[in-house]
Amino acid sequence: MTQIKKEDLNLFNRLTNKQFEEIKPYFEYQKFKKGDYIISENESVNKIYIIKSGLVKLYFRDKNDNESILSFAFEDWWETDFTAFFNNSKSVLNLQCIEDTETFCLHFIDYNKIINEFKLADYFLQKSINGHIASQNRILSLLSNSPKEKYEQFLKIKIHRKEKNKQKNKYKGPKSFTRNADRAQ
């Protein structure tokens, strides 16, 4: 089992080391292969998945077997069928890995515990707002962009993500050296 580290998710940056040690047991590490389903329609949904690495898509499949993608989730984003999660109902959506993906998941009960015990409601509210904005932008794109423009927009996001990961992984020394190097430029 992979041990969760404080630098794995932005969520943990706002916590003291003591708080991190207390919150760590609530998160369950799960690894998925490209093509795996994290959530399938008609399943109970009792977890939120925070993406450590990889790429997933959340989609709906209609009665004619047509697939409509609702969202993509990258590193440090979270995803689930939120309606099913919060209403304790069966999923109508599918969450599938487009790449090999690592996640840290939170069970519904644990999600509520950490919201209250660690005062993280503001963090999850901001995540929700960012997700809502991304959904609105996606809907606008669907309504106004050609298939080619939609694909180009997706590629820009993917390229930006890869560049961000390159920068993140570029320097492996102490953080204090990184901050000093940033100031020198």
What residues fall within each predicted segment?
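A residue-level structural signature of the nucleotidyltransferase/glycosyltransferase Rossmann-like core
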Residues: I48, T103-F104, K162
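Cyclic-nucleotide recognition modules
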Residues: I69-I129
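Short phosphate-coordinating micro-motif centered on Lys-Gly-acidic
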Residues: I38-E43
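Glycine- and acidic-residue-biased ligand/ion/polar-headgroup-sensing regions
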Residues: G35, N46-Y59, N64, E75-D76
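Cyclic nucleotide-binding regulatory module and flanking cytosolic helices
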Residues: M1-E28, A84
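Short, Lys/Arg-enriched N-terminal segment that forms or immediately precedes the first helix
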Residues: K5-E7, G131-L140
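Short, Lys/Arg-enriched anionic-surface-contact patches
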Residues: T80, N137-K150
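Phosphate-/nucleic-acid-contacting segments
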Residues: N145-Q185
